[in-house]
Amino acid sequence: DWIMKQLPEKSGYKNGTAGFYDLAAIVAHKFNDKHSLNVYGYYSHDRFAFNSNEKYGYNNLNASARWRAVFNEKLIGYFSAGYDHYDYNNRETVNASAAYKLSFDINQYFVKADFTNILADKHTLNFGFKSMLYHINSGTYEPEGSESFVKKDVLQKDKALETAFYLGDEWEITPKLSVNAGIRYSLFSALGPRSYYQYASGMLPHESTITDTITAGAGKFMKTYHGPEFRLSARYAFTDNF
């Protein structure tokens, strides 16, 4: 707020306010030589206002935990789970009869497992999976204050599930030549509950070609996209420095 007060009157922002803060915490515990746990948390809040009638706010929240397990001298596993949240809101009250609040938020939940398997002194296999569930509030427009005549409008919420499995091979063939190859198989599914339009066969999507409205129940897989992703790279050292 102090910085805003230093601005010239003609800037139009002299009566504005701004502020932010962040909180973070990490807890790590080693149970023994084979098992350890890390827990992480983060929260941030930002606010800004050009004046008392126009305000903006943002919030971020992250929380996760990771378990490290050494199964043997050649196999190590990392198991993680977490939650991410972001929200935004804008309040406009210059005109009491048209005052509104606009808000949006997204939530993500994930689990993943990563493994490192040392096949030989210079040959390592990496594999695992990750799955993430998305909950998205695409937008809410609503009246701000009892005098507002704004009509509330809420966009449909979106839910989706994204999952991927991967396998990678790192091999140092010689001190000069190494190869890294891998494959990742990804799946993305749109989930209910949600209503969507059905269009006339062979016609472009348009209001005039809508033939029906389909309602998918909670948790129903409406559409799934999937496919492999390949990766191949090589490194060759011509000299010790190049």
Residue ranges, per PLM feature:
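Hydrophobic, lipid-facing positions within transmembrane beta-strands of outer-membrane proteins
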Residues: 21-25, 41, 59-65, 81, ...
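Transmembrane beta-barrel wall of Gram-negative outer-membrane proteins
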Residues: 12-47, 55-77, 81-83, 119-120
